[in-house]
Regions:
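Transmembrane beta-strands of outer-membrane beta-barrel pores
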Residues: 70-76, 87-89, 101-107, 118-120, ...
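A charged, amphipathic interaction segment
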Residues: 149-171
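Active/binding-pocket-proximal capping segment
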Residues: 331-341, 346-350
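Noncatalytic modules at the cell exterior or secretory-pathway interfaces
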Residues: 12-16
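Residue-level detector of the transmembrane beta-barrel scaffold of outer-membrane proteins
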Residues: 17-19, 65-67, 96-98, 129-135, ...
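Outer-membrane beta-barrel initiation region
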Residues: 2, 8-10, 21-124, 160-166, ...
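C-terminal outer-membrane beta-barrel translocator/porin domains of Gram-negative envelope proteins
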Residues: 131-144, 155, 198-324
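Outer-membrane beta-barrel translocator domains and adjoining extracellular loop/strand segments
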Residues: 111-114, 143-149, 167, 182-190, ...
Length: 351
């Protein structure tokens, strides 16, 4: 009888690999870890196989997938042409990596990303997954201006082990975001041209149920020049007539700040976040006029209109409400209260 662990000594008969359940007589969901090469090299436990597009994994090979890329990320890079190379198959696996070099037509530059991570999965407990790794991205954020973002991270993911059908997920994430901007000709934003680093902690509790959606998170950021704390709560309900009602509450405050007066890059934004951590998919992040400057991203203040006082360097609170009338036609209303240094709190609204 085999207990939790037992060692076996296998005679060395010049075998090149050892296989458990070779004839698959014992039912198993995941057979990938039944193979062990006798070469002792964990990176080449199986021969490499190259495939276009994601496919069902082979038990006999380590597979690399090639996916051609034709995409549009922003107006500065324009059309991106390249290749995504990764080892992510249909089933989860511990070690994952991906690299995506692309040529950006408008910026005439090589951009893209690279990511490597390691996953540990747990059964029959609320902590279901721990993953850590590093990601690097390089792209344009303005004309003739590039940003390199380096992020080592670790995530702890939770779910109800007694109800695996539940859509509720929780996560605690830690990351250290390094931003380095490369200005070729841009002369604005000089104050933030030097590299900066931000340590970010975020706890998320989300239920992605289609009918009763809710999500809240608590976020803390720390750097040499500032510390911030913010809270976001959002609920969405669907009626029997297929109408949606959405309510969102946001509050954020600086814990400390050494940011020079007049510098708004790290302030709380009422309607259009500055995105100094480059987390949002702006089509034209550096635009101040035109259609791309009006791109709507619901974050921070979440306002839909541009107001005279759009930033807060002390604290900001807001309430956003919206309801669908017909398909994608909605009505909305926003109210907020913000505070800047040396000024009284300001009440703002739009609809």
């Amino acid at each position: 009888k085999i207990g939790a662990k037992k060692q076996f000594v296998v005679p060395n008969n010049l075998a090149d690999k050892l296989v458990l359940n070779y004839d698959q007589k014992v039912p198993e969901f995941d057979l990938r870890n039944n193979w062990k090469s006798t070469s002792g090299n964990p990176l080449f436990n199986k021969p490499l196989q190259f495939r276009f597009f994601k496919d069902v994994e082979s038990l006999h090979d380590n597979q690399l997938y090639f996916l051609p890329i034709i995409e549009f990320r922003n107006i500065y890079d324009g059309l991106n042409l390249g290749m995504n190379i990764n080892n992510k198959g249909v089933l989860n696996k511990p070690f994952l990596f991906g690299i995506s070099p692309v040529y950006s037509v408008n910026s005439n530059a090589l951009t893209g990303f690279a990511k490597v991570g390691y996953n540990t999965y747990f059964e029959d407990q609320n902590l279901c997954n721990i993953n850590f790794g590093m990601a690097i991205t390089h792209s344009s954020f303005a004309e003739n201006a590039f940003v390199t973002k380096t992020v080592p991270y670790v995530n702890f993911n939770f779910r109800d082990a007694t109800n695996l059908r539940s859509n509720e997920l929780k996560s605690l994430s830690f990351r250290y975001v390094g931003i380095e901007k490369d200005f070729v000709e841009v002369k604005d934003d000089e104050a933030v041209a030097p590299p900066y680093k931000v340590f970010n902690i975020r706890y998320i509790d989300a239920n992605n149920s289609f009918k009763k959606y809710h999500k809240w998170f608590l976020d803390a950021q720390f750097s040499d020049d500032f510390g911030k704390l913010s809270f976001n709560y959002e609920i969405r309900r669907r009626s029997n007539k297929d109408q949606f009602y959405n309510l969102r509450v946001y509050a954020g405050a600086f814990l400390y700040s050494k940011i020079p007066s007049g510098e708004q890059n790290f302030d709380f934004a009422l309607d259009r976040p500055t995105d100094y951590l480059f987390d949002y998919n702006y089509l034209g992040q550096f635009e101040s006029t035109g259609s791309f400057s009006q791109q709507l991203i619901i974050a921070e203040g979440g306002f839909k209109s541009k107001l005279d006082t759009a930033f807060a360097n002390e604290w900001l609170t807001s309430l956003n409400a919206s309801a669908s009338i017909w398909k994608y036609v909605q009505v909305y209303g926003d109210i907020g209260l913000l505070k800047n240094k040396g000024n009284n709190p300001l009440f703002v609204y739009d609809a």
